[in-house]
From Swiss-Prot:
Stored HAMAP family: MdoC_OpgC (MF_01066)
GO molecular function: acyltransferase activity, transferring groups other than amino-acyl groups; transferase activity, transferring one-carbon groups
Membrane topology recorded in Swiss-Prot or TrEMBL: Multi-pass membrane protein
The protein, known as: Glucans biosynthesis protein C
InterPro entries found in the cross-reference section: Acyl_transf_3_dom, Glucan_succinyl_AcylTrfase, Glucans_biosynth_C
Gene symbol of the encoding locus: mdoC
Lineage of producing organism: Bacteria, Pseudomonadati, Pseudomonadota, Gammaproteobacteria, Enterobacterales
Enzyme Commission numbers on file: 2.1.-.-
One CC-aspect GO term: plasma membrane
Pathway: Glycan metabolism; osmoregulated periplasmic glucan (OPG) biosynthesis
Function text: Necessary for the succinyl substitution of periplasmic glucans. Could catalyze the transfer of succinyl residues from the cytoplasmic side of the membrane to the nascent glucan backbones on the periplasmic side of the membrane.
Entry's family note: Belongs to the acyltransferase 3 family. OpgC subfamily.
Protein origin, superkingdom: Bacteria
Length: 385
């Protein structure tokens, strides 16, 4: 068992929680954006569309960097098999719990909201399976991807550790320019793979499980490994936590390119491939922007921050059906998009916190939505000697 730092990375905990909670305004703004979703407002809002695109352009890339960082930290703490078991439990159990309790009722609700309940019996067996794959995994996709990544990293992390034992890690030097070139190449490589699949067998790209297990994992795995490397090499971590005007400017320009691709790109042409290249490098640069900002403002411990760090996963899991309920049944009665957006935030966050407090008082639910066993504190006094 290898030693790990005793000091908790408070700013990384906070950033991870905020990125999770950003899913709430992201999905609520999606209702009022120009993007087609399960439910949409009568008229889209340009500013809420821009806000939605901004969150979507970088949020999950930074999230997976932090996940990789903490995953490697636990990798050094536990034996290999126990590490895999602990990690898979912590993400797999909440995912499997949320399917029958959250996404299945959500799917049934949407069938009636969108008027598709009557046509369901007429679908082919494959169409039913694929629809269920998309709808039941839904916003839980990142948990499935984390399970896949954890399994792959049983081998990858072992290789990294073995290579470190045979080399001097203090001599490893990183620069943002070098990383940018690497991630640009990774983005191009991903685009080539996707385009090849599109040419050879396009229907597979519409398969839900293939999209989650293969394509999403393939895109986000470099960020996950980057997080592990940031834990290993202090110089790399310092590169991300030190503010960089170059990264900020590059991220801003990349976001403009992202918006232009969204506006003028075509799904039948190269829009998705171009997006993968842009978001690969944009995600890297935003790691610096977010980490440096968080390190400066969020690197402290407080009861309020700890509360939302602990609550973030549960709140994220329950917010999605609440958001769709709001969009389907309440949004049509609010004429102002901005008022609807603010009401949606209050509605979803308020109910999510109430549900979180309720679930804390039910040990079984607390275990199922966290994947962590409920620890009973021993109050017995130590025997006298």
């Amino acid at each position: 068992m290898n030693p790990v730092p005793a000091q908790r990375e408070y700013f990384l905990d906070s950033i991870r929680a905020w990125l999770m909670l950003l899913g709430i305004p992201f999905h609520i703004s999606l209702i009022y954006s120009s993007h087609t979703w399960h439910v949409n407002s009568a008229e889209p809002s340009l500013w809420l569309t821009l806000f939605n695109d901004f969150i979507h352009s970088f949020r999950m890339q930074v999230f997976f960097v932090i996940s990789g960082y903490f995953s490697y930290m636990l990798f050094l703490r536990y034996p290999l098999k126990k590490w895999w078991k602990v990690r898979v439990k912590r993400v797999g159990i909440p995912m499997l719990t949320a399917i029958p309790l959250l996404t299945l009722p959500q799917f049934i609700m949407l069938q009636y909201v969108k008027g598709k309940a009557e046509s369901w019996p007429g679908l082919s067996l494959y169409d039913k399976y694929n629809t269920l794959a998309w709808e039941l995994i839904s916003h839980l996709w990142f948990l499935l991807v984390l399970v896949v990544m954890t399994t792959l990293c049983v081998w990858i992390f072992k290789r990294i550790r073995n290579n470190l034992e045979n080399s001097d890690k203090t001599n490893k030097k990183f620069s943002m320019v070098k990383l940018s070139v690497i991630f640009l190449c990774l983005g191009i490589g991903y685009a080539v793979i996707r385009r090849t699949i599109f040419i050879v067998y396009p229907p597979i790209l519409s398969n839900g499980m293939f999209n989650f297990i293969v394509m999403q994992t393939l895109f986000y795995l470099p960020f996950f490994i980057l997080g592990a490397l940031a834990f290993i090499f202090p110089h790399l971590k310092a590169l991300f936590t030190t503010p960089s005007r170059g990264c900020t400017l590059a991220a801003a320009l990349a976001f403009v390119a992202y918006l232009l691709n969204q506006r003028y790109g075509s799904g039948d042409a190269w829009m998705y491939e171009t997006e993968s290249v842009i978001t690969m490098v944009l995600g890297l640069w935003m790691v610096n922007v977010v980490f440096s900002f968080g390190h400066r403002l969020l690197n402290f411990q407080s009861a309020r921050v700890t509360y939302f760090v602990n609550a973030s996963l549960f709140i994220y899991l329950v917010h999605h059906p609440l958001t769709l309920f709001f969009g389907a049944y309440i949004t049509p009665h609010i004429t102002s998009n901005w008022l609807g957006f603010l009401c949606g935030l209050i509605f979803v966050v308020g109910i999510a916190i109430i549900l979180y407090e309720i679930h804390l008082r039910i040990p079984l639910l607390k275990f199922l939505f966290s994947g962590k066993p409920v620890v009973k504190r021993e109050n017995d006094k130590a025997p006298a000697r």
